[in-house]
């Protein structure tokens, strides 16, 4: 196959950051995607409707001229989030709220320390039709980092799903066979996003032959058996799994340091890399559902009407991109050859 035409895809999980970084990240995503679920872990975090609306305005201002890209805003849940916050956010057009266990990812220190305390908020979200997006890891210091996702499912996610069967839940950026099995066995109100890095890589790609900081993300890459479970899941074409890049930019100096930041900046190549994975799996016929249909259907939003075309054409991802502030950023898969290209 030399060409694939798809309904224009959406990215159901990414990080734009803020301020002048938006001048890089927003055009990178708008190049391919019609809509994106924008994570709220700024400093300070996006904890209410007013902050979400202001952030949306900053994103819209960074769109390329003529772009129809639409940011879909989210709320950052904290222990002080109230039912009124949820109602106001829904009224302002916020589509989802994000649950971060405290310390689980970049800028999550303000996040939730006692999940059961938020049950009244979850009940209101179900009532309002607002989705719950979950970074599914426990963060206690004694827990092995490779076991965080499995234990979160066992200790918290089962309880949330059983307690609130009408609440739509997305387990974000899943990394384990445990997550695949849980989502597959759960009701139609439970789904998951999967990143390109977790389909393409496993922990050997992070640690063998030297530490590779630009492959470091959270949740951390797992062993090959978990990677294969993710690949098998997307190859089935199940509507429970859909595209969420978790594209997360950090300046080169923040990644290449004694305590490097987590995140892979994949916006410039994500769809092409997903296509490469689906081709390897002999499942290119399943790519459109994963990239363009399943997420919109789960969110209860209309599918996009425009199309994009990928052509079989080799190109090399740049070694570095210069940010608006002049600092370099290393994109995901920098310097590597990709077999599919987005047709202009």
Curated annotation (Swiss-Prot):
GO annotation, biological process: 'de novo' pyrimidine nucleobase biosynthetic process; 'de novo' UMP biosynthetic process
Protein EC: 3.5.2.3
Q: Where does Zn(2+) 1 bind?
A: 13, 15, 98, 246
Q: Where, in this chain's numbering, is substrate bound? A: 15-17, 41, 135, 218, 250, 262
Swiss-Prot/TrEMBL keywords = Hydrolase, Metal-binding, Pyrimidine biosynthesis, Zinc
Q: Can you quote the record's cofactor note?
A: Binds 2 Zn(2+) ions per subunit.
Coiled-coil annotation: which residues?
A: none
Binding of Zn(2+) 2, residues: 98, 135, 173
Domain of life assignment: Bacteria
- N6-carboxylysine PTM positions read 98
- Is Nucleotidyltransferase found in the keyword set? no
The record, for InterPro entries, names: Amidohydro-rel, DHOdimr, Dihydroorotase_CS, Metal_Hydrolase
Show the GO MF annotations. dihydroorotase activity; zinc ion binding
Q: Give the CC-aspect GO terms.
A: cytoplasm
Q: Which reaction does it catalyse?
A: (S)-dihydroorotate + H2O = N-carbamoyl-L-aspartate + H(+)
What is the recorded function of this protein according to its Swiss-Prot or TrEMBL entry?
A: Catalyzes the reversible cyclization of carbamoyl aspartate to dihydroorotate.
NCBIfam families reported in the protein's UniProt record: pyrC_dimer
Subunit structure, per the record? Homodimer.
**Family in the record:** Belongs to the metallo-dependent hydrolases superfamily. DHOase family. Class II DHOase subfamily.
**Name of the protein:** Dihydroorotase
Where does this protein come from, organism-wise? Pseudoalteromonas atlantica (strain T6c / ATCC BAA-1087)
Its organism's taxonomic lineage begins at: Bacteria, Pseudomonadati, Pseudomonadota, Gammaproteobacteria, Alteromonadales
């Amino acid at each position: 196959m030399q060409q694939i035409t798809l309904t224009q895809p959406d990215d159901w999980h990414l990080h734009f950051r803020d301020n002048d970084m938006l001048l890089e990240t927003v055009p990178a995503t708008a190049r391919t995607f019609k809509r994106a679920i924008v994570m709220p872990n700024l400093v300070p975090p996006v904890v209410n409707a007013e902050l979400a609306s202001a952030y949306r305005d900053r994103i819209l201002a960074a769109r390329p001229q003529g772009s129809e890209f639409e940011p879909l805003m989210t709320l950052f849940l904290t222990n002080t989030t109230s039912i009124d916050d949820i109602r106001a956010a829904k009224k302002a057009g916020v589509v989802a709220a994000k649950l971060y266990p405290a310390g689980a990812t970049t800028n999550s220190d303000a996040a939730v320390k006692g999940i059961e305390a938020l049950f009244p908020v979850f009940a209101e979200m179900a009532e309002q039709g607002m989705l719950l997006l979950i970074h599914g890891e426990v963060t206690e210091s004694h827990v092995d980092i490779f076991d965080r996702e499995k234990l979160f499912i066992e200790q918290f996610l089962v309880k949330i799903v059983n307690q609130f069967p009408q609440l739509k839940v997305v387990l974000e950026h899943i990394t384990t066979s445990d997550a695949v099995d849980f989502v597959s066995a759960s009701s139609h109100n439970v789904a998951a996003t999967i990143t390109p890095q977790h389909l393409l890589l496993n922990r050997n790609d992070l640690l063998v032959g030297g530490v590779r900081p630009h492959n470091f993300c959270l949740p951390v890459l797992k062993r090959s058996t978990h990677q294969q479970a993710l690949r098998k899941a997307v190859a089935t074409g199940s509507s429970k799994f859909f595209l969420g890049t978790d594209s997360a930019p950090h300046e080169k100096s923040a990644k290449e340091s004694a305590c490097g930041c987590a995140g892979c900046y994949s916006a410039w190549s994500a769809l092409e890399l997903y296509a490469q994975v689906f081709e390897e799996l002999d499942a290119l016929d399943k790519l459109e559902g994963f990239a363009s249909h399943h997420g919109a259907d789960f969110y209860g939003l209309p599918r996009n009407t425009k199309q994009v075309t990928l052509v079989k054409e080799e190109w090399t991802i740049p070694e570095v991109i210069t940010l608006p502030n002049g600092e370099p950023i290393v994109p995901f898969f920098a310097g590597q050859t990709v077999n599919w290209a987005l047709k202009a």
